[in-house]
Amino acid sequence: MTSSDPTLRPERLPEDMDRALRPQSLEEFVGQAEARANLRVFIESARMRGEAMDHTLFHGPPGLGKTTLAQIMARELGVGFRMTSGPVLAKPGDLAAILTNLEPRDVLFIDEIHRLSPVVEEVLYPALEDFALDLVIGEGPAARTVRIELQPFTLVGATTRLGLLTTPLRDRFGIPTRLQFYTEAELTLIVARGARMMGVDSDPEGTQEIARRARGTPRIAGRLLRRVVDFALVEGDGRLTQAIADRALTRLGVDHLGLDLGDRRYLSLIAENYGGGPVGIETIAAALSEARDAVEEVIEPYLLQQGLIQRTPRGRMLAHKAWRHLGLEAPKGPGQADLFG
């Protein structure tokens, strides 16, 4: 989105900074209390039995800690960690090369697992159930199937689009776990920890200001923290205060709800061009010059969570809160009757 500040998009941080700011254990991990409590039980049980932990699926919006939790699982299980992604595994041989090199009880993390090709997914089924690979050698009448035994391992899948997973693949995960947006209090702790690790002095009000505008997402909180620290060093005395945080984030185009220029463009489009909706997702994506997936995965989850938009069978509609946020008056037409009376 051309008018959107990339600071607010939950793409990954540079690897060195990303790794430095990540918690290294479940004890350090802030938020996702229910998921952490359950994972602690499953990890301890696997360690006591000396077996591979059951296959685990993390799903939810991007930037909530799916990769971090997978790394923590491997660390607390005391086993190796291998990481890949669905689009990278283009053919069965790619998957076979990884699986045959796993040590006993290792954790294999597949990001964007909903993007696995069907042919690779078919090879994965026996690997998950029987720890074996069934590969076809040769072609035509001379083709034969060879079974390769694998070491027991734990597959951790991550997806932002649970609905795109096939039912057979989804059913093979014994531990499905949904990650939720973080509270402001949780993000404040995360930002304060990040500031300490960066060697930056901070005021509670300053870290809270960043947390308030981080869209419930730790990855965005970390990115905003780095930008605010830049302003604190160049235009302040190096201390992260509420005033410098507010000034920096305002200049970055982040409002008090955490919406950026792209979010406000989305809301304004529906308000000004379509009278508040309903309007179809394909129309919205075309008008914004964005891919439909980008709109559904990146922009809409937080707007829905904040109660700014509503998904209906006829399309997207603005909620009353969105009209107030835009400083506009909601129309009283029949299309809005169900939302505004």
Curated annotation (Swiss-Prot):
* CDD domains membership: AAA (cd00009)
Provide the residue positions that the database annotates as binding Mg(2+).
67
Origin: domain of life: Bacteria
Its protein name is Holliday junction branch migration complex subunit RuvB
Query: What Gene Ontology terms describe where this protein resides (cellular component)?
Result: cytoplasm; Holliday junction resolvase complex
Q: Which gene encodes it?
A: ruvB
Tell me the segments the record calls region Small ATPAse domain (RuvB-S): 183-253
Which top EC class applies here?
A: hydrolase
Entry-linked SMART domains: AAA (SM00382)
> What InterPro entries does the database record attribute to this sequence?
AAA+_ATPase (IPR003593), AAA_lid_4 (IPR041445), DNA_helicase_Holl-junc_RuvB (IPR004605), P-loop_NTPase (IPR027417), RuvB-like_N (IPR008824), RuvB_C (IPR008823), WH-like_DNA-bd_sf (IPR036388), WH_DNA-bd_sf (IPR036390)
Which residues are recorded as binding DNA?
Answer: 292, 311, 316
Q: Which reaction does it catalyse?
A: ATP + H2O = ADP + phosphate + H(+)
Q: What is its EC number?
A: 3.6.4.-
